């Protein structure tokens, strides 16, 4: 299966989005609710239908930027959130994106890219995170699939990979995952020191 812009757009066009839970995940919701600085610049790569961005915007975070290959996913988001600034919706390649962000949210993007791209993902994250910026989100702690998304993995493989690029890496079992993902997710907090 070739993972291309056309494939992802087609999946959104056909509503073939089995990973989409239809709302923000509980671990991220609770994390966002404790954030105090509403002026931080946030990026959500591989944002899909972007329920996280919708929730952040409702909380008063106005510098939320979304990037996805699939224009249909961004269109879905814009339809639900017509007041969200169009200039902060980017249809493009995460690996070519430029900018600096205080917070980057990981929610099913890492598992959607081929495992061969994981090191490239971390190099790009390092470039996009401002000094003391954070990468926060969820990773599957489950084997899942090796030939198609969602590509899985285990904490034992993630830690050395993430630690190669970041010296502040925390990965803990998510205690508040939705039932279908219980005991299968890691909540990650990575700081760009």
What are these regions (language model features)?
Residues 108-112:
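Short catalytic micro-motifs in class I SAM-dependent methyltransferases
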Residues 105:
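A conserved beta-strand element that flanks and buttresses the S-adenosyl-L-methionine
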Residues 1-99, 113-193:
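Class I (Rossmann-like) S-adenosyl-L-methionine-dependent methyltransferase catalytic domain
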